[in-house]
Amino acid sequence: MSHSIPITSSPPPALKKLKLPNGSEEPSEFERELLDITQAVHDSTDQTWDRPPLPSSFEDISFQQLDAEEYHDRGNTYARFFGITQEGHSVLCNVTGFIHYFYCPVPKGFEENLTEFTNYLKATFDGIERVEITSKESIWGYSNNIKTPFFKIFAKNNISKIRSAFQNGQVHNIDPCITYDNINYLLRLMIDCKITGMSWITLPRDKYKIVNNKISTCQIECSIDYRDLISHPPEGEWLKMAPLRILSFDIECAGRKGVFPEAEHDPVIQIANVVQKSGESKPFVRNVFTVNTCSSIIGSQIFEHQREEDMLMHWKEFITKVDPDVIIGYNTANFDIPYVLNRAKALGLNDFPFFGRLKRVKQEIKDAVFSSRAYGTRENKVVNIDGRMQLDLLQFIQREYKLRSYTLNSVSAHFLGEQKEDVQHSIITDLQNGTKETRRRLAVYCLKDAFLPLRLLDKLMCLVNYTEMARVTGVPFSYLLSRGQQIKVISQLFRKCLQEDIVIPNLKSEGSNEEYEGATVIEPERGYYDVPIATLDFSSLYPSIMMAHNLCYTTLLNKNSIKAFGLTEDDYTKTPNGDYFVHSNLRKGILPTILDELLTARKKAKADLKKETDPFKKDVLNGRQLALKISANSVYGFTGATVGKLPCLAISSSVTAFGREMIEKTKNEVQEYYSKKNGHPYDAKVIYGDTDSVMVKFGYQDLETCMKLGEEAANYVSTKFKNPIKLEFEKVYFPYLLINKKRYAGLYWTRPEKFDKMDTKGIETVRRDNCRLVQNVITKVLEFILEERDVPKAQRFVKQTIADLLQNRIDLSQLVITKAYSKHDYSAKQAHVELAERMRKRDPGSAPTLGDRVAYVIIKTGGDKNYEKSEDPLYVLENSLPIDVKYYLDQQLTKPLERIFIPILGETKTKELLTGSHTRTIKVAAPKTGGLLRFAKKSEVCVSCRTPLKKDNLGALCPNCIKDGKGPDLYGNALSQMNYLENKFSRLWTECQRCQGSLHQEVLCSNKDCPIFYMRTKAQKDVHQQALELVKWDNTNW
């Protein structure tokens, strides 16, 4: 295909000369980075697309499987595993011979011959292969370890239909009944073959067949019977990672003015690609595909195309050739991938949507709504790219982190500590329509947007952590982004049940309204504590309760079963909320066993982590221990999920009941033991208790003593509980500000020499729904109170800030609030939505579109509703509109400040702090437009005495002031003011150039999340105003 496409690859630039092609400029920071990469990467592999060639003959094939799917062919179901060998060869393994099955209890008195029954089923239902009778135990309820007979029904297809027939009583001589082990084909196969997500599989040499008539683009394509697979548990040498190829890409579109790009109309003009191998730090492919010419970029290839169609087809060829295992990017799932597919469709490129690993499978876009209690509801687009894993960093970060803003800019600033230039989509078209130099600028911008997701992937360890989560829970990697928490527990449950001959009932998920009491919170004794507060934490509280008391489906009793099995009180535990569970000597529960294995494996991973020296292996082990911890904690949540596969409120409510009891017991034990009557100099006091921790005031002033006592108290109280429940001493807060339940701040100490950090919970330093001023003020106030121990200084700072706010001295960037403009209908009018509508009426070209974040400030208007008072910050700057400072004081600052100062100063003094004499002076900017000003006729006045000037006087002064000799001083002041403003603007402009990575190019950035953007805009306006004033001085005759 490639020879027919008119493309040119620009020559690699001379790396020694650090100049652009026009010789005008030094390279930007980002280009220096590209240069470093080029010099660091081995020459022979740099910019090489192809995978390493295959050896002439194979022995055993071992590969790490990445993606798995089931497929149907001529009435049979099979599985496909895609993977990569240690040498970097791509593999497609077709697994044959496995037949899906489910269980159904054999009815009492079943006297039919099994062969007759099987023949009847085969004649009635399409797809039945065979039926066996086997002895199993149901997971639900203690059964005295007695197994009962079950039909094991094997079906090549139509398994859901057959299962429903048994459940609905459509099978001859069998009443409606519960069926067991309802799980999809792929997971059933993986569980039975002991394959976990991202694990290694070996295909023995004489067991697999090489497929010559290949359906995939993989280097090795083979078939094997499932019984011949060798699956390696992820431990020891099999914890390794294959050299996965990770492609990060970004596209740029040339949109029309005022319209967000639409694939039917707006072309894709550039695609930047960066490919890196997992475990390596430098990408070995860096290129940009462009429409039209483009000047060269250091250390990167440019592929120029005359037509967009040629560029897209060449990019598709690039994907097939470089053969990425993982495709990443930022918002690629909902924008970039669907956009290129829709654009190719609009251009009639029928051969384009085939860049997966299956040659004849077309890439198609589906809409999916993902909803879970943990992650909320999100609408996403899903594209099948068979054999290639997709990891959209935006979706990953939205799932794992709570941030103020999720733009790539904000996220990069938060995690990587660097900003990037943010070019508005309307400017992109101007750059594309300019010269090859402006297109080069766009290409550098696009390439950086492809680099950043790779940097985030490395920093946040997404691939490593998700790999370990797939290995620990057993599910395919793709499930981790597309499914909720439950599937992970189900997978572990089925694996353990298979070992123990236990089957799991297929219960209808009905979502009961039954509620159970949550965790205890000991009422906080609010206040400011200038003494050390020790924190005692239960290690893995809920998992350890389930293990200590053997809480499980398989150990659950009721009064009838206690009587039927002749159990005594020594045989079972009665939980605080009145449920019964048998002791582990009679039956060790499945859930406690799973938890025991997870926590033991975590201890081992943490021990290995301490010994490991290789940085990549350390990351893998850290990801593993994290995955094990998360998995252990999610088992409890699974039992309490009323809309779930296997809800059991007896387990979940017993866990929280034990938890409540233990927090109370800890409080009483500590206060009883560390008391004056027990020979201690102070009475210890538990000032707050949360789900799994208690805060203790021992009374001592010095940190070291409190740390020793904390350690001692944790060990002492642990002896009062059943194994493996353990109380641990982790930290001391000193000083500590306890505001309310789940709201506190303090300095966090783990060693007496120096505090580790300032720790806050539920306080506005971490809240996302307020302006930057609140965050900055609260952070500063806490620094003064906690780090400097200087409350009067904090009070002075607050008074000064409030005075500055009321007198219009706070920079506008501090007052900007941003919210996402989404398509959902809001029940009440929203400030940012109403503003977006007003902006559209003013200028459709610059108005926010769906998906954008709308930045606004609250201004003084005739209306009293906030949605009437929201305004675009740029419009406010241009027209000098007055800010509603009372809104910012009353609605944004007052409550957070009250929460901090009332525990310290009391209500009266806090009120004085927020409403004292420093709040009497209010200055408001005079608007330039609107209201009566529309009818006012503006006349020029003398800059000295404010006397109106005659029409023919275009100068700055009236004749009287000229006669009095005021000119020179006033002119000098005007010049020095101009000098100050130009200097300020120049500093801000340089800061923006430094951020964009070049000190010579014009600043195009319009990042509304960045405070400098508004400062720069205001400074530019101030310089312009002052220049107009100086023109008047030029026209003054003096």
Curated annotation (Swiss-Prot):
One of its GO terms (molecular function) is DNA binding. It is found in: Nucleus. GO terms for biological process: base-excision repair, gap-filling; DNA replication proofreading; DNA replication, removal of RNA primer; double-strand break repair via nonhomologous end joining; nucleotide-excision repair, DNA gap filling; RNA-templated DNA biosynthetic process. Residues 1-29 are annotated as: Disordered. [4Fe-4S] cluster binds at C992, C995, C1005, C1010. Keywords: 4Fe-4S, DNA replication, DNA-binding, DNA-directed DNA polymerase, Exonuclease, Hydrolase, Iron, Iron-sulfur, Metal-binding, Nuclease, Nucleotidyltransferase, Nucleus, Transferase, Zinc, Zinc-finger. The CysB motif binds 1 4Fe-4S cluster and is required for the formation of polymerase complexes. Binds 1 [4Fe-4S] cluster. Zn(2+) binds at C942, C945, C958, C961. It catalyses: DNA(n) + a 2'-deoxyribonucleoside 5'-triphosphate = DNA(n+1) + diphosphate. InterPro entries: DNA-dir_DNA_pol_B, DNA-dir_DNA_pol_B_CS, DNA-dir_DNA_pol_B_exonuc, DNA-dir_DNA_pol_B_multi_dom, DNA/RNA_pol_sf, DNA_pol_B_thumb, DNA_pol_palm_dom_sf, DNA_pol_type-B. GO terms for cellular component: delta DNA polymerase complex. In eukaryotes there are five DNA polymerases: alpha, beta, gamma, delta, and epsilon which are responsible for different reactions of DNA synthesis. It holds the Pfam family DNA_pol_B. Transmembrane segments: none annotated. NCBIfam families: pol2 (TIGR00592). Its cofactor is [4Fe-4S] cluster. A motif (CysB motif) lies at residues 992-1010. PROSITE patterns: DNA_POLYMERASE_B (PS00116). A zinc finger (CysA-type) spans 942-961. This polymerase possesses two enzymatic activities: DNA synthesis (polymerase) and an exonucleolytic activity that degrades single-stranded DNA in the 3'- to 5'-direction. This is DNA polymerase delta catalytic subunit. It comes from Candida albicans (Yeast). Heterodimer with subunits of 125 kDa and 50 kDa. The 125 kDa subunit contains the polymerase active site and most likely the active site for the 3'-5' exonuclease activity. Its EC number is 2.7.7.7.
